[in-house]
């Protein structure tokens, strides 16, 4: 089986697993941007009866939001405790979602199932090999399928905003959540998508205000951004 995980990253999120669904806890920013992310995806693809896979699903925030758009949702993550939280929360809320403790690369190696939509949001900056992850996501897509990615740009502004501001000044993220060297420029992520056989359709910036705790999509790719691409039909 192919491994593309940073053990320290997995342990970091495993330790926080019990707090995934606390809207005022360490994952508060994700709770705030989650509806925005789900609506962005659902506005580009009609999810009704679509087979959707969320890679790096954590405690299941995005999976449950996409379930509400009538998709057939699966989630995978390498941090086992988070998967258990996701399973429990989905069951408690009567949402039929399939969760597995496995990486995208391992899933490619272990089964032939393909998906109409693959999402991988706020995950790429936590793995050693971004290209391997994007390629695995592409390999899990059906021909004509849609891929949604999001991450953080790498520049002085993103260091000030996403690390200094978010982790040390406003304390909206636990210290050590991000490593600047793992941030990815949009041009680099677009190159990863092309190498993986994905045609880039759209890129949007995402702004989170740490004072008002409001978020919106825009055309500023300076810090957080999303990419949407399609796999050719043949």
Label each residue range with its predicted role.
Residues 1-21:
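N-terminal, positively charged/glycine-rich alpha-helical extensions of SAM-dependent methyltransferases
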Residues 190-196:
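Substrate-binding/catalytic lobe of Class I Rossmann-like enzymes that use SAM or dcSAM, i.e.
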């Amino acid at each position: 089986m192919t491994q593309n995980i940073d053990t320290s990253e997995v342990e970091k999120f495993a330790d926080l697993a019990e707090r995934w669904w606390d809207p005022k806890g360490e994952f508060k920013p994700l709770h705030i941007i989650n509806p925005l992310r789900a609506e962005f995806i659902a506005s580009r693809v009609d999810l009704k009866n679509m087979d959707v896979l969320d890679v790096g699903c954590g405690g299941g925030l995005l999976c449950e939001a996409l379930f509400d758009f009538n998709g057939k949702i699966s989630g995978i993550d390498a941090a086992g405790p988070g998967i258990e939280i996701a399973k429990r929360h989905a069951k408690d809320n009567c949402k039929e979602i399939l969760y597995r403790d496995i990486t995208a690369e391992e899933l490619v190696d272990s089964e032939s199932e393909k998906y109409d939509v693959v999402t991988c949001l706020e995950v790429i900056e936590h793995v050693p090999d971004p290209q391997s992850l994007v390629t695995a996501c592409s390999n899990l897509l059906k021909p004509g399928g849609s891929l949604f990615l999001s991450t953080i740009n790498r520049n002085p502004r993103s260091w000030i905003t996403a690390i200094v501001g978010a982790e040390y000044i406003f304390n909206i993220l636990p210290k050590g959540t991000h490593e600047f060297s793992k941030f990815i420029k949009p041009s680099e992520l677009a190159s990863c998508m092309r190498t993986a056989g994905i045609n880039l359709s759209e890129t949007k910036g995402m702004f989170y205000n740490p004072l008002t705790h409001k978020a919106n999509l825009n055309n500023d790719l300076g810090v957080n951004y999303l990419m949407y691409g399609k796999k050719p039909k043949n």
